[in-house]
Amino acid sequence: MHKLAQLDQRYVWHPFTQMRDWERAEPIALVRGKGAMLEDAQGNKYLDGNASIWTNLHGHNPPQLNRAIKRQLKQVAH
């Protein structure tokens, strides 16, 4: 099991998940995203059909927004 999945099982409560079902399956550890796609620790790719408003509009990891965020973080981190 991927380290992220182990940490998730140990420390994260998923309030809208049936715990009995969740405990039987190995969690998916998402490690990167680009555009509308996500990738897990095993290299499997998924279409993100559950994205937030931000990623619905811009996708995951858009270069222009990443640059703007880096510039802003140099001025004020939060």
Where are these regions (language model features)?
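Active-site-adjacent loop/helix segments that line or gate small-molecule/cofactor pockets in enzymes
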Residues: 1-32
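Conserved active-site and cofactor/substrate-binding residues in soluble primary-metabolism enzymes
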Residues: 3, 33, 60, 64
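Active-site and channel-lining beta-strand-loop segments
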Residues: 27-48
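Glycine-rich loop-to-alpha-helix module at the N-terminal edge of alpha/beta enzyme cores
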Residues: 45-78
